[in-house]
């Protein structure tokens, strides 16, 4: 089965890659370890995958599978949130001012605001704070409020 990466490269999908992504979001030093089973989530995700699926779609599918497992353990909600936030962060510029420049180019952000951003705001952003939301809060922001270049903190 082939997967389309964010870069546009097409690669072979391996079960271990899905498991590794889930495990990483469970075991990173900045995160509290969750009582979840990455293999079990990955198995459910793998059964719903199709040839040509994008890595972003895999993340969305993985989050949906994790949230469906919330009745087994509430930690699956936290895992779903981490997957969703990580996916959002991967699609947005790493720097707040770069995200605002992209929005400025589309007429969403004013010239005055851009001047202020360059002077003050980049240092205020801590990407780890994006993970302070719950899954449903992140999904609400993603579907109703965030522009394509924004993480929850950029809003």
Protein language model annotation of sequence segments:
Residues 1-155:
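Extended catalytic cores of very large enzyme megasubunits
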């Amino acid at each position: 089965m082939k997967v389309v990466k964010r870069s546009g490269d097409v690669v072979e999908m391996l079960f271990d890659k899905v498991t590794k992504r889930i495990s990483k979001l469970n075991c990173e030093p900045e995160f509290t370890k969750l009582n979840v089973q990455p293999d079990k989530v990955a198995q459910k995700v793998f059964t719903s995958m199709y040839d040509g699926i994008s890595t972003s779609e895999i993340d969305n599918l993985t989050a949906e599978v994790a949230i469906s497992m919330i009745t087994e353990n509430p930690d699956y909600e936290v895992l779903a949130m981490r997957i969703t936030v990580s996916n959002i962060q991967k699609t947005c510029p790493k720097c707040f001012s770069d995200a605002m420049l992209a929005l400025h180019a589309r007429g969403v952000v004013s010239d005055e605001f851009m001047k202020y951003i360059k002077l003050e705001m980049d240092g205020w952003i801590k990407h780890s704070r994006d993970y302070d939301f719950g899954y449903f809060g992140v999904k609400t922001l993603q579907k109703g409020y965030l522009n394509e270049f924004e993480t929850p903190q950029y809003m």
